[in-house]
Design a protein with these regions (language model features):
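Surface-exposed, short loops/turns at beta-strand junctions within beta-sandwich domains
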Residues: 76-84
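Short, aromatic- and glycine-rich surface loops/edge beta-strands on solvent-exposed regions
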Residues: 44, 83-93
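Solvent-exposed serine/threonine-rich low-complexity stretches and specific carbohydrate-binding patches
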Residues: 53-65, 104
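Aromatic sugar-binding surface patches on proteins
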Residues: 62-75
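Short, surface-exposed binding/anchoring microloops in extracellular/periplasmic proteins
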Residues: 11-46
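Edge beta-strands of extracellular beta-sandwich domains
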Residues: 96-105
Length: 105
């Protein structure tokens, strides 16, 4: 259990690229001004419409704080393909940020 202030960040948008440079699925988040250099991101969780959760790892899945991605051939992410991401949760040094989104994969 994380003991931190949770903030819901409304109005964010996600640009999905399905043939990214680093990963098969890449997401760039806009409207979420997290200063990742001053406020370390410890982890990110993607939640889908059916309640499934997928944790992201630094370097492999998280770049520059708010750029996210994963490869379709990674067995861990195989079951997320075809689902809709409804929430992205950032665990950062100064709290937890919940971003309601609607990203169909």
């Amino acid at each position: 259990k994380v003991h931190a202030t949770e903030t819901t960040v409304e109005g964010t948008t996600v640009e999905l690229n399905t043939n990214g440079h680093h990963a098969t699925y890449e997401m760039k988040i806009s409207g979420f001004d997290l200063d990742y250099k001053a406020n370390k991101v410890y982890g990110v969780v993607l939640t889908t419409a059916d309640g499934s959760e997928y944790g992201l790892h630094h370097v492999t899945n998280i770049w520059h704080g708010t750029k996210l991605g994963f490869n379709a051939d990674d067995p861990y992410f195989a079951s997320i393909i075809g689902k809709t991401i409804t929430q992205i949760t950032f665990y950062a040094a100064d709290g937890v940020y919940v971003l309601p989104v609607n990203v169909a994969l």
